[in-house]
Amino acid sequence: GLITGAADDDPSGIATYSQVGAAFGYGILWTAIVTFPLMIGIQIVSARIGRVTGDGIAANIRKHYSPWLLYGLIVLLLVANTINIAADIGAMGAALKLLIGGPAHWYAIAFGAASLILQVFVPFPRYSPILKALTLALFAYVGTVFVVRIPWGHVLYETFIPSMSFNVHYAIGVVAVFGTTISPYLFFWQASQEVEQQRAKKGEEPLTEAPQQARRSLRRIQIDTWVGMALSNMVAFFIMLTAAATLHMHGITDIQTSAQAAQALRPLAGEFAFLLFSAGIVGCGLLAVPVLAGSAAYAVAETFQWKIGLGRQLMKARGFYTILSVATLLGVALNFTPTDPIKALFW
């Protein structure tokens, strides 16, 4: 739940939240209130599917529905995840360029390679604490709010009694927020991580076979999911708020990337806000890319009944790691084409 929630605030999500905050100001903040219970509900269901059945979402769809439905969903997930990986890696490269200078494309290659090496060659029990530590990067966006001037009374009013704009651009912005917040790859990742955790713990079985374990397991899932989704939504709210209080209030309403948002903050909110925002992009990207690539690999491997798991060695789950590697490498490669991954995700 914690890693899932933190991965939801990836660099492409940061770009979307910055875009809508800059474009619509405080009038978009209400979306964080609406998405919160929706996120909790769907992520708890996803986790329960994994814990109860001992299989991920793709494996359960394969058992109960038409294979063509499954194949269609998996193709869409693969395409979306690959574009998302491209957007995140590109954003990380651009953010690091802002921080230290140098070529953004080379940084993108380095981030992609580092992420891939970590996933393929480092055992997941040793890798998981690194992912959890990277969730601390989200607090950069909490800190950013407190170094800019915020009219809190007006913010609270607009959050709960928003002044909405009934036009196409506003509707697209709302859909973009919902789409980046409630993302399918998180469903697959959450369910598959429950399966991984259950298989790794001695004595734990799927709840269909060990119903006596249900009370403890379902309570853990509920607490974990509430904490993760609360953190995710709080950060999304603060990113939109930062963009609204700085960029929108100074007439900057057209933001295309998270790095552009960080750069625009510099003269308006100061060097510290800029550094926090930029560093957050890098940290959140390092967390999100493994989740995106991993969820794609879980989905495809479960579909074709291959051996799965980040806890397995490379040669014991070759199909799984092949999909993970291809998704990551294609994501890196897309940054060297005319395609704009951020724009593709938004639309």
Write out the residue ranges for each language-model feature.
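Extracellular/periplasmic helix-exit of transmembrane alpha-helices
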Residues: 38-52, 192-200, 212, 230-260
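Juxtamembrane transmembrane-helix boundary signature
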Residues: 3-4, 31-64, 73-83
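Hydrophobic transmembrane alpha-helices that form the core helical bundles
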Residues: 48, 52-53, 70-101, 108-113, ...
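Flexible loop linkers connecting adjacent transmembrane helices
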Residues: 16-19, 44-69, 94-96, 201-204, ...
